[in-house]
Amino acid sequence: MFYKIKGTHDLLPTQTTSWQKVENSFHSFFKKHQFQEIRTPIMEYAEVFHRAAQHSEMVSKETYAFPDKKNRLITLRPEGTAGIVRSYIENKLDQTNKLQKFYYYGPYFRYERPQFGRYRQFHQLGVEVLGKTTPFLDIEVITLIYQFLKSLGLDDITIQINSLGSKEDHLDYVDIFKQYLKIYSNYLCGLCHERLNKNPLRIWDCKTCHLQDFLKQAPKIFDSLSPKSKKRFQTVLNGLEAMKVNFKTCHDLVRGLDYYTHTVFEITFNKMVLGGGGCYDHLVAALGGNQLSGIGFALGMERLMLTLQENNNFFVSPQPSLKLFLFILDPVFFHHGLTLVHILRNEGFCVEFNYSFTTFTKGLKEALKCLPNYLLILGHQEFAKKQITIKNIKTHTQTTIDQKDLIFYFQQQRV
């Protein structure tokens, strides 16, 4: 008789039904919000991951890597972002001048010690948005993952959030942190001695050193951020508060991959970390593409299923109907506009909106690229009067209604 490999697990029919419900809910939820599915190979050339995160312990110590018959080093993917960025560049999507919103699902592989909710072959649900990052896009992505998990019945979700600032902020802090740690080098564990020169931020994740007073009193990366980076982060926090996302700032949070910049976050339920993500300003260029930014997150499916099973919660999201685009003309109205977006989405409508602010003509062109049935315009006059202007793209007719009548108006258009 043969046995499964250590760190893997079988999903029997009694389990796959529950998994399918969550998978279908994930597909439905992010399709409704204008994300498109992407599927990349489970194997990549090892250089893809080394270029993406050369100092990461996941890449240097936990990957399944082997030479093929032509002696090229192949790696079973340990995470989703690098392979998706490789595909984004190889297929010239970085040259389209269009924001690309992907979602993905599949198996991943890491050679680490198996424990509760953690396997050597595991599954992730994830999202990557490539082409730009703005604080408003950070708000959107974090709000969506928060609302997706709440749609599954997980009401006690907390987003642990921090900012790593720009690349320049990051480098300044690393110098300060390394100088500080040299004083206490005798107190570092063996692994953290290695980290000190390769990836010192990972010392914050050490379960041994983290308990010691010298690390508790160490300078935090947030203190090294430029005023511009701090302002960006505060914009994100203000937006999450406006969207009633339960979050907690955590200046010890650094994440395990060294390509992150600015916003980083982890998704927790009680004490269980379900996943995490963040922004990356230089990853696309590092893999040979244009200088473009992105933001993404991944959820561990195994951990999510354990959490759902403990709470007996499963929910399948409804399919979207009409396709709407809310054109917010001024960032002053952003929080109000985003609230309207989610009111409509919660009624099953497919709604997109602008993440950045430019001239009316350019903004209108970007809106029409999404091929909406209706264009909703929120300008100064509409905001002041609590109204919204609605343009039917097909008939070219236009009307202005009170915002409180939005749901009723579009329910009538469904008939």
Swiss-Prot record:
Gene3D superfamilies: Anticodon-binding domain, Bira Bifunctional Protein, Domain 2. One of its GO terms (molecular function) is ATP binding. Belongs to the class-II aminoacyl-tRNA synthetase family. Its EC number is 6.1.1.21. It is found in: Cytoplasm. Its main location: cytoplasm. The gene is hisS. PANTHER family: HISTIDINE--TRNA LIGASE, MITOCHONDRIAL-RELATED, HISTIDYL-TRNA SYNTHETASE. It is an enzyme of class 6 (ligase). This is Histidine--tRNA ligase. It catalyses: tRNA(His) + L-histidine + ATP = L-histidyl-tRNA(His) + AMP + diphosphate + H(+). GO terms for cellular component: cytoplasm. Homodimer. Keywords: Aminoacyl-tRNA synthetase, ATP-binding, Cytoplasm, Ligase, Nucleotide-binding, Protein biosynthesis.
